[in-house]
């Protein structure tokens, strides 16, 4: 083999080696790009999910539109109260069966859960202040009564959504048994806390005297 053939063969081998290195670099770049694309897609989906959850957390919640109490002729104290609850504007559906009611008076803080069955009051608004609806309330449970429930979600599953209105019955005579309910000039605070979203706030001070059986408290 003369010198010209040797140099020619060497250049050919060098060219093939360069081509192999180039192909390897292209493959590595392709794999890296694929990993970056997949990672980017995952992060984008994760960010979207997190953003949606954050929006629901901020927008969702309950609102207390009023609280009414009934004073007993026996103890002359408020033996049960009714809080009217509706979802906040823009709120997602909320499962009231998982909501906890926190109520505090006279150094006693009670935590109540929903009774397992809601009362359907949409066919004809029931007397939510009557004693007959107290059978499902106790010192540890409150009663949900649906007043507006277009899709029947409250009556079926105790799920409150847009346009719904419910009454929450609380037996304060049993919750605060030591005082046989809530007397005059008493400060009461509480909240109905759902699984997610803002709670419905209950806070009132009873009047100096109870001149009527039914008392508007909040």
Swiss-Prot record:
Top-level taxon of the source organism: Archaea
Disulphide connectivity of cysteines: none
Carbohydrate-modified residues: 38, 71, 77, 115, 136
One of the record's GO cellular component terms: archaeal-type flagellum
Signal peptide: none
One matching Pfam family: Arch_flagellin
The family this protein is said to belong to: Belongs to the archaeal flagellin family.
Protein name per the record: Flagellin B1
Organism annotation: Methanococcus voltae
Gene designation per UniProt: flaB1
């Amino acid at each position: 083999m003369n010198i010209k053939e040797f140099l020619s063969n060497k250049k050919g081998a060098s060219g093939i080696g360069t081509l192999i290195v180039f192909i390897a670099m292209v493959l590595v770049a392709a794999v890296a790009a694929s990993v970056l694309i997949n990672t980017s897609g995952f992060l984008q989906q994760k960010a979207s999910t997190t953003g949606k959850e954050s929006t629901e957390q901020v927008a969702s919640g309950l609102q207390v539109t009023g609280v009414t109490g009934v004073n007993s002729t026996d103890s002359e104290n408020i033996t049960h109260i009714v809080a009217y609850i509706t979802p906040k504007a823009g709120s997602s559906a909320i499962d009231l069966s998982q909501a906890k009611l926190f109520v505090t008076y006279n150094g006693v803080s009670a935590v109540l859960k929903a009774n397992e069955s809601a009362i359907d009051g949409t066919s004809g608004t029931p007397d939510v202040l009557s004693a007959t609806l107290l059978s499902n309330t106790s010192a540890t449970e409150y009663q949900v009564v649906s007043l507006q429930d277009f899709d029947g979600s409250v009556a079926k599953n105790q799920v409150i959504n847009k346009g719904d209105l419910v009454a929450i019955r609380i037996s304060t005579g049993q919750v605060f048994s030591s005082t046989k309910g809530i007397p005059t000039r008493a400060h009461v605070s509480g909240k109905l806390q759902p699984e997610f979203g803002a709670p419905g706030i209950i806070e009132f001070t009873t009047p100096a005297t109870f001149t009527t059986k039914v008392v508007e408290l909040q």
